[in-house]
């Protein structure tokens, strides 16, 4: 019986540690049942209340024709379009921001090669339009407008419509041709010209009389001289001969000279180059749709405000930067500590040191109290706004950092790529590795700052309350204060809004503190009571056992023999 009484006293005493009957006020922060894990400088897994994904992984499976102008080459690549191959007439006069080359594009005319194909392709793509200016060329005593069965247009033998195939005259003559064109305009001119390589010496003399032929094209700053390479080659569209196409840019005030004794594929004019255009080219099989997007990749369009993407390295327009990571989360809320279940017999409350509060929905920080009038919860808007102000704009600042640095690095790498083409892939891989690391580091820095800021605001709120209460309350060590005076809801509100006057309650608090401390059982007293209770219980059990044995012996129920 005594043990039961002592046990009840201990339970009551243990419960009174959580709530003594004095008012309690706790500081806490918002929490959710399931937060989001983010990475910081010091920890790979930190749970926060809210976070924003920064890496776009969703793609529109089509190319958007607005706001960027797209030109679909269909069966023609951009070089065939510039040469005027059959089937490319739809590209005459075309203008674009992005020229779409299809993997299914095919050559449809006389077989050719371009020794500096990628450079010509880049010049044409960057120019953003096919603005062809026809010119008159005076070729003497030669036959013009050569045609080929390999180049059908409407089932009739034809040729590249931007070029003029010169062969010997009907009188079997191909005299030296020397023709000069001066650029008197205010723009640069692009001339595309070619050299025919026959398959046999007989073909050479049948077409040009002279063997070998020669083509020399010069400007004030450059000269290209080509001697035809005569020889048999695999048949392509019925032809074993080939044409090599070259290109020359003539700046304003410069001139171009064509000198040949045979094999020249002459231009019919020039393309006007626009130095102000910033167009490009994209090789993809993705169809053009009716959507709107400023960003295109070889896998489709992106419509996003995220600063990074993990869809394709090839991205054109106003696009997120490509990174290797599939996910980078930016913390937009505080550290998350899910709320524990109610503790104790009397539902004791706890503050931010032990857990967050899932019921705090009007702010990030707030108060809970327990007094004679009941319990309550209220948000603290001042500390909430202070934290939000420091976090707002974090995503925009991150985008500004990445954009500024990316453009600088991009320019440096482009110069390297232009000079050392063998290093192009290595440079691209290095650029992506660098930006993937950069992005991860920037996000980790911002996440660390967010968590530090939100923790700091929580501590500021706690210190603000502690300075108000002073000796009128006791810090319980869990984010709560036990108040040693009567504190109704108005009093609690004054603590929350910073108008609490501790001098008014000082005397009452001191008296109550001493009275409570005088009657509290210390840990030593509890130990003594437990030992006394245990000893008495053991004594009673032994006494009862001995009494039972004596009673049984007297009644003959137990016989006891002692042998010596």
Curated annotation (Swiss-Prot):
Which Pfam family, an example, fits this chain?
Hemagglutinin
The lipid modification S-palmitoyl cysteine is placed on: 553, 560, 563
Keyword list (alphabetical) reads: Clathrin- and caveolin-independent endocytosis of virus by host, Clathrin-mediated endocytosis of virus by host, Disulfide bond, Fusion of virus membrane with host endosomal membrane, Fusion of virus membrane with host membrane, Glycoprotein, Hemagglutinin, Host cell membrane, Host membrane, Host-virus interaction, Lipoprotein, Membrane, Palmitate, Signal, Transmembrane, Transmembrane helix, Viral attachment to host cell, Viral envelope protein, Viral penetration into host cytoplasm, Virion, Virus endocytosis by host, Virus entry into host cell
Modified after translation how?
Palmitoylated.
The record places the following residue ranges in the Extracellular compartment, namely: 17-527
**GO terms assigned for molecular function:** host cell surface receptor binding
Keyword Transmembrane helix in the entry? The reply is yes
**What's an example Gene Ontology biological process for this entry?**
fusion of virus membrane with host plasma membrane
Membrane-traversing stretches = 528-548
Summarize the protein's role. Binds to sialic acid-containing receptors on the cell surface, bringing about the attachment of the virus particle to the cell. This attachment induces virion internalization of about two third of the virus particles through clathrin-dependent endocytosis and about one third through a clathrin- and caveolin-independent pathway. Plays a major role in the determination of host range restriction and virulence. Class I viral fusion protein. Binds to sialic acid-containing receptors on the cell surface, bringing about the attachment of the virus particle to the cell. This attachment induces virion internalization either through clathrin-dependent endocytosis or through clathrin- and caveolin-independent pathway. Plays a major role in the determination of host range restriction and virulence. Class I viral fusion protein. Responsible for penetration of the virus into the cell cytoplasm by mediating the fusion of the membrane of the endocytosed virus particle with the endosomal membrane.
- Subunit structure of this entry? Homotrimer of disulfide-linked HA1-HA2.
Q: What else is known?
A: Major glycoprotein, comprises over 80% of the envelope proteins present in virus particle.
Protein name, UniProt field? Hemagglutinin
């Amino acid at each position: 019986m005594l043990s039961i009484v002592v046990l009840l006293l201990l339970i009551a005493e243990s419960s009174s540690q959580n709530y003594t009957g004095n008012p309690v006020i706790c500081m806490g922060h918002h929490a959710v049942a399931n937060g989001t894990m983010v990475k910081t400088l010091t920890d790979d897994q930190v749970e926060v209340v809210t976070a924003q994904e920064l890496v776009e992984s969703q793609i529109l499976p089509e190319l958007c024709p607005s706001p960027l102008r797209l030109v679909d080459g269909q069966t023609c690549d951009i070089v065939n379009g510039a040469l005027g191959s059959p089937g490319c007439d739809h590209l005459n006069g075309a203008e674009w921001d992005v020229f779409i080359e299809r993997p299914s594009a095919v050559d449809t005319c006389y077989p050719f090669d371009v020794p500096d194909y990628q450079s010509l392709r880049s010049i044409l793509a960057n120019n953003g339009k096919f603005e062809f200016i026809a010119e008159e060329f005076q070729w003497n005593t030669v036959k013009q407008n050569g045609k080929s069965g390999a180049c059908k247009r409407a089932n009739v033998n034809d040729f590249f419509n931007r070029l003029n195939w010169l062969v010997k005259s009907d009188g079997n003559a191909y005299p030296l041709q020397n023709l000069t064109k001066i650029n008197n305009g205010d723009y640069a001119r692009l001339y595309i010209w070619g050299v025919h390589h026959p398959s046999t010496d007989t073909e050479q003399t049948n077409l040009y009389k002279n063997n070998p032929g020669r083509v020399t094209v010069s400007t004030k700053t450059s000269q290209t001289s080509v001697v035809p390479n005569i020889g048999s080659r695999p048949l392509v569209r019925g032809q074993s001969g080939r044409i090599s196409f070259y290109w020359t840019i003539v700046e304003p005030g410069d001139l171009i000279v064509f000198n040949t004794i045979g094999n020249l594929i002459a231009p019919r004019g020039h393309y006007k180059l626009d130095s102000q255009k910033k167009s490009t080219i994209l090789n993809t099989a993705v169809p053009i749709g009716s959507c709107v997007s400023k960003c295109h990749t070889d896998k489709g369009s992106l419509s996003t405000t995220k600063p990074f993407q993990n869809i394709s390295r090839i991205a054109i327009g106003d696009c997120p930067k490509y990174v290797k990571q599939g996910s980078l989360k930016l913390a937009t809320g505080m550290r998350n500590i899910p709320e524990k279940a109610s503790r104790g017999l009397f539902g004791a409350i706890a503050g931010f040191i032990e857990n967050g509060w899932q019921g705090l929905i009007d702010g990030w920080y707030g108060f809970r109290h327990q007094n004679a009038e009941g319990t309550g919860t209220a948000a603290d808007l001042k500390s909430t706004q202070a934290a939000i102000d420091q976090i707002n704009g974090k995503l925009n600042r991150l985008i500004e950092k990445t954009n500024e640095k990316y453009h600088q690095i991009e320019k440096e790498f482009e110069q390297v790529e232009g000079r050392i083409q063998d290093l192009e892939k290595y440079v691209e891989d290095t650029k992506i590795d660098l930006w993937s690391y950069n992005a991860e580091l920037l996000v980790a820095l911002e996440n660390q700052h967010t968590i530090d800021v939100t923790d700091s605001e929580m501590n500021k709120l706690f210190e603000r309350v502690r300075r108000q209460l002073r000796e009128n309350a006791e810090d319980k060590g869990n984010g709560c204060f036990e108040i040693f005076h009567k504190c109704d809801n108005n009093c609690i509100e004054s603590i929350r809004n910073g108008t609490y006057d501790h001098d008014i309650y000082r005397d009452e608090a001191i008296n109550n503190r001493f009275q409570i401390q005088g009657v509290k059982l210390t840990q030593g007293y509890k130990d003594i009571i437990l030992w006394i209770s245990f000893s008495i219980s053991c004594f009673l059990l032994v006494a009862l056992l001995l009494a039972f044995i004596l009673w049984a012996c007297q009644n003959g129920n137990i016989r006891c023999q002692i042998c010596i």
